Amino acid sequence: EMATIGHIETSDTILNKVLKNAWWGIYGNYKGMPVDCPQRNERQPWLGDRTVGSLGESFVFYNERLYSKWMHDICDAQRSDGNIPDVAPAFWNYYTDDVTWPAALPFTCDMLYHQFGNRQPIIDSYPSIRKWINHILAEYTDENGIITKDKYGDWCVPPEKLELIHSQDPKRKTDGKLIATAYTIRCLQLAEQFANLQGLKEEAKVWADRRSGMIEAFNRQFLTNKAGTSRRPGHVLYPDSIYYGNNTSTANLLALSFGIAPLELRSELIKQVVKGICIDAKEHVNCGVIGISWLLRGLSDNGFPDVAYLLATQRTYPSWGYMAENGATTIWELWNGDKADPKMNSGNHVMLLGDLLTWCYQYLGGIQQKGVNVQQVAEADASVAYKHIVLKPAISIQNCESVKADYETPYGVVKSQWKKTLQHVDWDITVPCNTTADVYLPDGKVETVGSGDYHYSVEIPTRDAAILKDEFLYDYSGFPSAHASTITQLKNGDLVAAYFGGTFERNPDVCIWVSRKPKGAKAWEKPILAADGVYRLGTPEAKKAGLSGIDEKTTPADKGPIKDGLRRFGVPAGYKYDFRSKSANIKLPANLKRKSCWNPVLYTMPDGEIWLFYKVGSTVGDWTGCLVKSKDGGKTWSDPEALPDGFLGPIKNKPEMVNGRLICGSSTEKNGWRFHVEILDLKTNKWKYVGPVDAELKPRTDDVDSATVDMEHPIYKEGEKARLIYSIQPSILKLKDGRLQVLMRTHNAKLATSFSSDGGDTWTPVTLLDIENNQSGTDAVTLKDGRHVLIYNNFETLPGTKKGSRTPLSLAISDDGTHWRHLLTLEDSPINQYSYPGIIEGKDGKLHCIYTWRRQRVAYKEVDLKKIK
């Protein structure tokens, strides 16, 4: 038995399952030495599996003796010429003269010293390390100063086809010479540290000089540096052409993690890594064994712990969570272990853990050491064996709500347990005897404390002083995805928000949900089901439920939640629907069918009644406009009523009341994007349809070449590329001269606008404004002082593309509705997406902003314009 010395639990259930699987995988592969896969006739102590993995394992198990013994095994297996095998003890004759696998010797010696304070493995192994490095330098350094020998590359990178074991795509492969040279540079750095530790100053200088020379050679050989080439300068997903090798994440991570990259280039290099993950890999892991060893720490070290957390909690392929979601109880050898060729496909292999465990303890738990960065590069006076602890959890990760971590250092147990909202954290720590700790608080303060137990209750500053409240409408809900939010304020100051939520947009289980925040409350109330898309066949309501109708082939009603099912349809009171299993506990009659719900819009009528407009349909072209009402501040909602045939109501953004008429900005998408207005006369209760409104001819971004520089060139006013401005989802402004103005989403990289001088009955042809649009929804509001505020993604869609990035999300302000300036950034993480916002001005002049947060939740911010600098 080997003692478990570390425990960690997070607010994410899938990550917790992965951590449990990691424990079992490591535990099952300790057999007097660290070995691999028990199910095939191998069971070998591969060095490369533990080059970095031993550090993560040391947070979980008391493995000092096992790894100290293994260092002797490796040294004993070394050949007389300095060659260290890939497997030690050398049961197999695998002396390939690789760098990354034998690097386990110096890397693990370093781990044993810093984690446990045991310097003896360094002293005992140093002659072998010296001999091995000199052998590599002598045999495999070419005329350019590059190490040419590499066996495995970035082993087991996620392949382009699930049945493959290894990728055949050259874009996914990292140059073996780059990997070997980078690891040699790191080993030279460790050799320098080991020499200094033993007082071998002259030898340390030799290692330092060789490392310096090899860094210069590495940058000459592998660095591309073309500054000023970004298509969107400053945007994290559009870096300059500055990268290493063929721009794999692994190549750039090694340069960043091993101190190779020039300081002035680090910000662009990490952007390349982030772009590779968020855009090219669609927010998934894109590394093999080498890159994954540095991925999470590399992201966090360089300002992107949120991207690291995204990868750590991802559930789909390729990810650790994908393994756990598909039956794994340990860690697979391959990212696609459930689909790949069984010739090399272990179900119990720990090499792909990379730096996950280390990152969880050091970043989520925040348990680090003074003077030792997360790559274990130590300063001269660095802490050893946690004599001086650093407690610095990544509390800035918005969707990580809590962490409980403890780790038994040689001095005793250190604990770090925290729970937070976006603006407040409660944090309990324990500092063991005979140690000190630097405690990094989220408000910027740092306290140095001695041994003992401490509790901190600290406010978390928002990203700008003008943001008074930063909240999620809910932490957890039954539905996994939410989108298209809207907000209104009642006369008593209560806030009511609505959004659609379900498996994902278009899924028939998507319903309309409402969240309330009473005035003075600290948190939003639990989501309320306000409307569904359920109908009974043969009823007038079903007949109106979409252009394609509802019939026997339509999705059964028990494929989603039902509002007031007992009263409306006689559904048993105990009916429940589970989004995860996509099943209900009760089978419903076959004549009950459902369609998806879309785009809610809230409006508080003059008498205080809340109207909630929404749409029902299988697709956008199938929409039927619907309405539910609430007389009790959004606590309960009426049965749905369909709008008159052909009317959809306000399509995304709030309407405006003008002279007793409700002016609803609307649009259609069935035969091209066309803007129109729907007007409800409250006296007569009759609807009027205005439009579709004419538009100018302009080129769309997806119709022009990617090299296009000037989309206003006269050539685009004629010919096949000159099309009507397609515009949808208008928001309505009230101008100082009495006119109405709409702002709209387009395909043209700019927002569109139109004006009405007669209260909405007629509108000018649609034109473009000089303010960017990413082909995503916006909202705007006219303030009491006559100014206007826009909430939008301030990203201009690139020529040759259909849509732009849905990050950042910002506010802009205008005096006249035509000329706008950027005011405040609300979100700027590279993780997609922050979109479909809503905005209102509160009774006290504060702005209430609401928006989709990564399609997972709905976020809310209260903004005080007076505090914007």
Which residue stretches match the model-derived regions?
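Asp-box/BNR beta-propeller blade signature and adjacent active/binding-site loops
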Residues: 128, 148, 157-162, 171, ...
